[in-house]
């Protein structure tokens, strides 16, 4: 699949485009913006719950900047694809806390699904650790 920064968006002509990772773009227009994820990249990088938040327009799954873009950011940070931002504005941990507050307010169903997924992953990891410890003890 060929990846190319978008020049047009559901919010208008793109005046700035930052590539977050292959197939994922943070775009700004004269008046608005968001995150645009090429459809095949969305299927590969985002959970079904995250995909459900976006809206399809052309070859992109789109996430409006005010409420829905944090869904993509949370997924990319969780998977280690991007690092949490730290700079003069965000000290360590503050960027993720900001994303989480936004998700809890604007996308509570996604937040609950994410928390459930993390709990299941933690339980699975604990079970595997216990099983390995038991096998070593034999």
Predicted regions and their residues:
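Eukaryotic non-globular interaction segments with acidic/serine-rich, low-complexity composition
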Residues: 1-29
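Alpha-helical interaction segments
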Residues: 1, 61-62, 96
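A short, structured beta-strand/loop element
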Residues: 26-57
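Basic, alpha-helical nucleic-acid-binding regions used in initiation and control of genome expression
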Residues: 50-51, 110-134
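Short, compact, well-ordered microdomains
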Residues: 66-122
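A short, exposed loop/beta-hairpin motif centered on an aromatic-Gly-Thr core
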Residues: 55-65
